[in-house]
A protein has these predicted regions:
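Histidine-dependent nucleotide/RNA phosphoesterase domain, centered on the 2H-phosphoesterase fold
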Residues: 1-154
Length: 154
């Protein structure tokens, strides 16, 4: 079974800003899968194959964590892996916000190590807002990215 641990985006104002970007991306002649605003999240850990028993252990750990609400400042937009072959369009966050999420990531990682459910993964805090399946000409996506390049909200 596949599973992941994430922090959900709950800020309605941020969701409205992302909807503006979604609108423009939706007008591009390309096969782009927009992430519904109700599903926007920061993935902390991804488990491509995990046993059901391990999921129960993880749930116990997560239920016992004492986390406070964090404020995130969004200040960038970009693509993975690059403009020649765009597969992900993401929203970035400022360094202070990244540090807060990284602290939560490390806390969870350390708890998972205690129960031997841990695999080191590269972690770069970002919010995936769209997946590009097929695009004949990336310049239109690039124009939308450039328009919102210096966004600051949150």
């Amino acid at each position: 079974m596949r599973a992941f641990i994430s922090l959900d985006l709950e800020n309605i104002g941020v969701k409205k800003e992302i909807e503006k970007i979604h609108y423009e991306l939706g007008r591009i002649k390309a096969k782009i899968k927009l992430v519904e605003t109700s599903n926007l999240h920061f993935t902390l850990k991804f488990f491509p194959h995990i046993e059901f028993e391990d999921i129960n252990k993880i749930i116990k750990i997560l239920d016992n964590l004492q986390l406070e609400e964090i404020k995130i400042k969004y200040n960038d937009i970009g693509v993975f892996p690059n403009y020649n072959k765009i597969s992900i369009i993401w929203i970035g966050i400022d360094q202070e916000s990244a540090n807060q999420i990284l602290n939560i990531y490390n806390l969870i990682n350390n708890k998972l190590k205690e129960i031997d459910i841990h695999k080191d993964q590269k972690f770069l805090p970002h919010l995936t807002i769209a997946r590009v399946k097929k695009c004949e000409d990336n310049k239109y996506i690039q124009k939308v990215i450039e328009k919102y390049k210096n966004i600051i909200f949150g």
